[in-house]
Structure formats: structure tokens, C-alpha cells
């Protein structure tokens, strides 16, 4: 995503935060963010040490996602019986482009139909049926929804993913911690966190599991209609039987996961991680 020189969402956020601080009567010599800090974030020289999280970038959002829908209708019959049937299916993807959310979907399969019979000049019958199968899969988001987090998450707080290769080879304790975690993303990133953000929506979507929802609905009714006008003008008799069945269930895989707050150092102009703190997350 965008890494223009001397621009970042974080730098813009911190600059505006300082302005609000001054407007509220804060002292110039006590700004929350120094000019050097803002420069480091604006330079984009190390987006892992100085993150600028853009929830709307192509790192996280697809340019487009698919919705597929197909349906078919069948009808026919003769003077004794007529029938109609409709079959439809749709599947909806998701615009999130990372972690388990890449596999999010909603789908529905529906079949409905009816048959009308003429049994005699005074008796007719009907049968109606409908069946719907609905399913959805989504990544767990324990920290409210992605879009809610996009509105409230501070862009400078946490780098969602940090390369393992940035850990100093001599930082044995940090390497041991990383070796013990089961959540190394794509074989090369660990999940970032901080004491203020023990977990976050990115970690959720990468590592906290999934939820699969299914529902089944079935409706059926059938009846007979009798014309008894030969007995008494306007007299008729109707019978009906109906069944309405529905069931729903969810299968959820809920995982806890560790995030790591790095301690950075600079050796000969190169940023390296010399320590990690999981802040109690596991």
C-alpha cells in the first residue's frame, strides 16, 4: 500500500493529535509526539517499527469480490395435473483479503414447488413444498468487527505482522519465544501486539479461528378441496395438513493466540529486534 515519501497515516494522525493537544491548552514543550517521532513514521523506513496501518489498503481489502447466483424454473402439466418448480443457488464472497477472512462466504440453496391435481369435477388437491439450505463461514473477530476497528484503531500502535528475520540472531530469548508459538504466518511473520493492544482484529482473523453456521428449513402443506354445491348451494369443504421444520447450528473453532511486542535497537544503521514481550498472551 502507499508509502509516499514523508507521508503516512500514522504521521498525519500524530500531527493532528498534537494540534488537538495544543487547542486544548497543552504546552508546546510537552507535545505527545515529537517531531523526530513523526518523521520516523512519515519516512516509511521501517513500517514494522513505525507502523502505519491502513485498513483500506490492498493488503487487507480486495478490489472486488464475487457473488454468484443461478436459478431455474420448470413448469408443465395437463388438464388433470399441473406442476411448477423453482431451484436457486447463490454464493457471496467477502471483500477481506487476508487470513481466514479470505475464505468468508455466505451461500443458500433453495428448492420450492407445487402440484395441483384435478381428481374429479368436484374434488381437487394440491401439494406445496419448500426447502432451504443456508450456510456461512467467517473468521472470528473477538475485538469487534473489522469495520468497527477500522474506525477506532490507532494506526501507529501495532504492526499486525512482523518478520521473524528481523530478530537479532543473538537475541536467544526472543528466538525461543517465537519457536514456541504455533502462529507463524506464512512461515515468516509473527503477530504484533503491545501492552495496550494485547490482541487486535488482525491477530483475530489470522489466528483466533473460524465459525461455520448452517440452517435447514423445510415447509410442506397438502390439501383437498371438495365442491359440495350439489348438496347445498355455495357449500364447500377443505382439508389441509402442514409441516414446518427448521434447525440451525454453528461449529466454532476458537483459538487463543500470542502477540509479541518487540524491543528495537539499531546496529550500524540497521533496525533489529533484540527482545520480545508477549504481555501474558498465549
Region spans (language model):
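Membrane-proximal, glycine/serine-rich, low-complexity loop/turn segments characteristic
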Residues: 1-215, 220
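Short, hydrophobic/aromatic-enriched beta-strand segments in well-ordered soluble domains
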Residues: 222-224
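Small-side-chain secondary-structure face that scaffolds active or pore-lining regions
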Residues: 90, 95-108, 130, 138-140, ...
Amino acid at each position: 500500500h502507499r508509502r509516499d515519501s514523508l507521508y503516512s497515516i500514522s504521521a498525519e494522525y500524530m500531527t493532528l493529535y498534537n494540534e488537538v493537544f495544543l487547542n486544548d491548552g497543552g504546552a508546546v514543550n510537552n507535545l505527545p509526539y515529537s517531531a523526530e517521532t513523526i518523521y520516523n513514521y512519515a519516512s516509511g523506513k521501517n513500517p514494522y517499527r513505525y507502523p502505519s496501518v491502513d485498513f483500506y489498503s490492498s493488503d487487507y481489502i480486495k478490489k472486488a469480490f464475487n457473488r454468484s447466483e443461478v436459478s431455474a424454473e420448470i413448469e408443465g402439466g395437463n388438464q388433470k395435473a399441473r406442476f411448477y418448480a423453482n431451484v436457486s443457488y447463490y454464493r457471496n464472497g467477502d471483500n477481506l483479503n487476508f487470513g481466514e477472512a479470505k475464505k468468508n462466504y455466505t451461500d443458500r440453496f433453495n428448492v420450492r414447488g407445487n402440484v395441483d391435481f384435478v381428481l374429479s369435477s368436484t374434488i381437487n388437491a394440491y401439494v406445496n413444498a419448500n426447502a432451504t439450505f443456508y450456510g456461512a463461514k467467517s473468521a472470528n473477530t473477538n475485538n469487534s468487527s473489522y469495520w468497527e476497528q477500522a474506525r477506532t484503531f490507532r494506526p501507529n500502535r501495532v504492526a499486525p505482522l512482523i518478520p521473524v528475520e528481523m530478530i537479532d540472531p543473538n537475541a536467544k530469548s526472543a528466538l525461543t519465544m517465537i519457536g514456541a508459538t504455533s502462529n507463524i504466518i506464512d512461515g515468516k511473520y509473527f503477530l504484533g501486539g503491545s501492552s495496550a493492544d494485547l490482541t487486535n482484529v488482525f491477530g483475530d482473523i489470522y489466528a483466533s479461528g473460524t465459525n461455520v453456521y448452517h440452517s435447514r428449513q423445510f415447509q410442506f402443506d397438502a390439501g383437498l378441496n371438495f365442491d359440495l354445491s350439489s348438496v347445498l348451494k355455495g357449500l364447500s369443504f377443505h382439508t389441509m395438513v402442514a409441516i414446518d421444520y427448521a434447525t440451525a447450528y454453528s461449529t466454532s473453532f476458537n483459538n487463543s493466540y500470542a502477540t509479541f511486542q518487540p524491543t528495537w535497537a539499531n546496529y550500524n544503521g540497521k533496525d533489529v529486534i533484540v527482545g520480545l514481550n508477549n504481555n501474558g498472551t498465549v
